Amino acid sequence: MRKQGPANALTGKGRRGFVLMVITIILVLLAAATIAYMGQMQTEYKASSMFGRDIEARMAAESGIEFAAAQIANKESDPSIDVFHNPTLFYKRPLGEVDNPAGQVRFSILVPNRTSDQGGIPRSGMTTENSKFNINRLIEFENDTDEDTDPFMAISYVPGMTQEITNAILDWLDTDDSTDRTGGAESAVYEALAVPYSARNGPMESIDELLKVQGVTPLLFYGEDANRNGILDPNEDDGEDRPPGDNADGILDFGFRDFLTISSRERNRLPGGEEKININNGIVAEMHDFLEDDADLGTEVAKFITGYRLTGDQNADSQAQGKLTIEQQQLVDWIAKNISNGELGQVTRNGMDLSQPPTASFRSIYDLIDAQVQVDIGGVPTTLTSPWSSSDGAALMEQMIALERKLTVLNDEFIDGRININTASREVLMAMPDMTEAIADKIIELRPPIMAGGASEQMMATRLSPIWLLTEGVVDLPTFKRLGPWLTTGGDVYSLQVLGHFDVGGPTTRLEAMIDATQTPPRVTFQRDLTGLGRGFDPAILDPAN
């Protein structure tokens, strides 16, 4: 038997060392794999958590839109609800309560506050589309018989607007294919483009259609406010260094979309949906009976309004006195023809002969103020004085608010395109016929400031009707009556932005929406995700400590 030599013994020790080294390497690799796996799992956990938080923020923002619609619906039964600027109601509303600030999700309903050249802090609330000029009404300016009414002058205060663009808009809206307007464009121009399309030749169905109109560029349409927050941000005031292209003049140039709309609309019905009393009703006897039967109006009101329709206001100037519309005149002619044929007997109310056709109509219910009519009552010439006098401003405010709820001058279910004098910008105010720069500046000057705690409720309580322009001395009565058909302090189509956000960290979702309250219940008609444009508002504004 041979003895194992030293070399063999050394080889055995080497093998044991080699195994130990292999085991060590394996353990190191396993540890590295474990660490890598744990890191990957941690990354996956963070990604999953962030994804979940992103969903929470989005759900919060969408909840904010539904909450806004609910508050608009509540406003119908409780007009005291302030949806213009109400931080208590719309600012940092929690979705549930949690102890961990990083897990507390909220929504804030905001509207960019375009109160200066640099913008301002956002309002906590909504704005009505009646704060803008309804571009579909532009064609009315051209068809108006008043020589002082000019389409370009109406929108010339909108930044970037030109005569050529105005003419192109008119060509887009009118029903013909005539190209006699300087700088205008009809379907033939658009159909020759690389991607052809035709002019609408009718009312626009979306304000975005302006981008199809010749001469309207994205910069003109959107302006320099790239992230749509209403604030002049550094990248919006640095020339061509960063998008958007701007002129670096220290002024935030807003776009057409901030001044123009196609959605401004108001309900022309009572809160329950019943029809208002139309004081331009072609059948005057029917109008009289509706007025007389109303418990809040009665015989004297019915007599005066009927007398006005028969003979007109003796105190009115030529521009403020309403004439019969074509439809009204046709109805009057039909009634007169049948009376002369003996098919309709004599019709009288309160001693007034309603067999004679009416000669006047109302441009707005404000024509009633300080009016005076001369009418035969029982065959005796009689002077009737308006029950609504401008001598007592406080009383007139209450009376006009009541009349606005009950009376109308139109049969239509909706009223389109009036301008909210409490919220419209100077550029939009100047679109109204008979508006002057001095009047527009005074309206802006008298608005309460937007503060963190809300607008001045006491001041706004006296401005529930456009009549405040008269009672606070902004305009005289003849001017107010001429402006009357354009004036409102309401609007039933609302626009807003909603942020879904956390108290600490986390993603933010920003949505833009439009809510149509001319329908019951109010309906969300438009929603757009603005998250890709960034948070938009300084995080300090949303800090729960503020």
Across the structure, where does each feature detected by a protein language model lie?
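N-terminal secretory signal peptides that target proteins for export/translocation
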Residues: 1-13
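Compositionally biased linear targeting/interaction segments
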Residues: 2-3, 16-546
